[in-house]
């Protein structure tokens, strides 16, 4: 058996985010950076690749773990980096005091990098984590010039409530916010080219239709297999890794997840979108809470709002998450035992219809790239949709235009 050398992963895209991190390293102040984005988007990968895993301290929160156990792991992490045996911490104030003490032993002429990943998992019920973090930042780190604290986590609700929109001691303390979006089609092509995949551009377009450019989903694919074989492997085999992804996707991100699922399901049933008033009527959600749900879903790229042509004050919300759309169409409520269902049904009318609708959505998601290809990226434009309801009385059919680009100079 020949020895093989594992090729290290390559950081695709993320140019703006890397530029921001470089600015943090060069600034003359301490930086509190939060890295946001949906589950599987590559938050940890970005930070690890940029810093080449060279941290002065790093810690990963543990899922559904009691406070004292989290504190014990935190103590072990400080012991690993400092080389000094740690006592048992009574609370998070003790833990951050120990972190301060260790960091003060490091050279003063460089930035110290602290990476706390899965931060929402650390904040267990009745823990003192957030208040201790506030004390650490306001009372010590923010008064220095050499600290870069990076906080990351998939739980969007927590990141928004506790950090971004914090009304307490962390109010307006975040110095940089990195929001990671899914790969574009171009970045997805770059990803496959990075290991000499034989997939054609049409193949890559089809891959985008069910992965939506989510890096982790792309990483599960076998680039030497056909698109159909990959779909069977990812969704229809007995141990298919993405078959159960939906069960965790939203619950990992949001509290009150049932309300989020209500919005997702009603938007799936109305593929061309609903206004906020229509969503409220269908889900019985309203007011500030509905605004929060819609904002968080938009933040994670699950939904988008579009203007209706000629009605600039009317926003329509549409489900745009490619994985969720694929799951509802072909996986949910289906109990087919065929492990190669996709390969056996390539001419299925449902697949053809899905591909048509999904291609429209890809165009909407890439309207900036389309404008650039048309040579109008430097001109002010608005992107909207247009629809005309059928007039049954006069036997006039309805019509829809999925993407209208209106130039401001015409």
Predicted regions and their residues:
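A cross-kingdom feature that marks ATP-driven nucleic-acid transaction machinery
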Residues: 309, 315-410
